[in-house]
Design a protein with these regions (language model features):
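C-terminal lobe/tail of nucleotide-utilizing enzymes
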Residues: 1-60, 65, 70-90, 164-170
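Flexible gly/pro-rich beta->alpha loop and the following alpha-helix that scaffold active-site loops
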Residues: 59, 63-133, 138-151, 155
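Generic recognition of cysteine residues
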Residues: 11-13, 18, 130, 145, ...
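Conserved small/polar residues in nucleotide/adenosyl-binding loops
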Residues: 177-181
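C-terminal, non-catalytic macromolecule-binding modules
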Residues: 150-176
Length: 181
């Protein structure tokens, strides 16, 4: 757009001064985006991984986060319902980081908890967003603190070790999902 003088034309139409823009930072960022010198593999462990657009904001944030590090981000899509103790090493053994995004309902949560445990035990960087952060707390309570049935009240109202509770202002709010969401 700069080559087409769009900014200059717009400024003239609006009777504004149009100083010459300094695009050096922009050009540097575009160069970094187009010419990364490394690849970082991130496992995105969720329950909606068949629908990549469900996580579009997370994907774009990862891509943009790679730019200043001169890195391209390779996302390994992991269905949390399919992740289990028999395949966790094979599925997550080749990643540089694990991200568990938000979600709703109980479906796939045990796979997310397993991913959080794998990250902790193997010293792999982990980022939990919303439900992803909650499952990391559940994992820690179960496997480090020894509260074997630790859970979120939202997901298991009968747990004897509730490590995630509903906020008081959420009490009585109808759930917008079912347990298999």
């Amino acid at each position: 757009m700069e080559k087409e003088n769009l900014a200059k034309i717009a400024c003239e139409c609006l009777n504004l001064d149009c100083p010459e823009p300094d695009l050096s930072d922009w050009k540097s960022m575009v160069n970094d985006l187009r010419h990364p010198d490394k690849e970082v593999r991130i496992a995105l462990v969720g329950k909606y991984t068949a629908l990549h657009d469900a996580y579009i904001s997370v994907v774009e944030a990862l891509k943009h986060g790679g730019i200043p590090e001169h890195a391209t981000i390779d996302i390994k899509w992991v269905d949390s319902e399919e992740l289990n103790v028999d395949n966790v090493d094979e599925v997550l053994g080749d990643v540089n980081g694990i991200l568990v995004p938000g979600g709703f309902g109980l479906r796939g949560v045990e796979g997310m908890i397993l991913a959080a445990r794998y990250a902790r035990e193997n010293k792999i960087p982990y980022l939990g967003l919303c439900l992803g952060m909650q499952v990391s707390i559940i994992e820690f309570a179960r496997h480090v603190c020894g509260f074997n049935d630790a859970h979120s009240i939202e997901l298991d109202p009968n747990t004897t070790h509730p490590v995630i509770a509903l906020m008081p202002d959420q009490d009585g709010v109808c759930l917008l999902y079912t347990s298999d969401a």
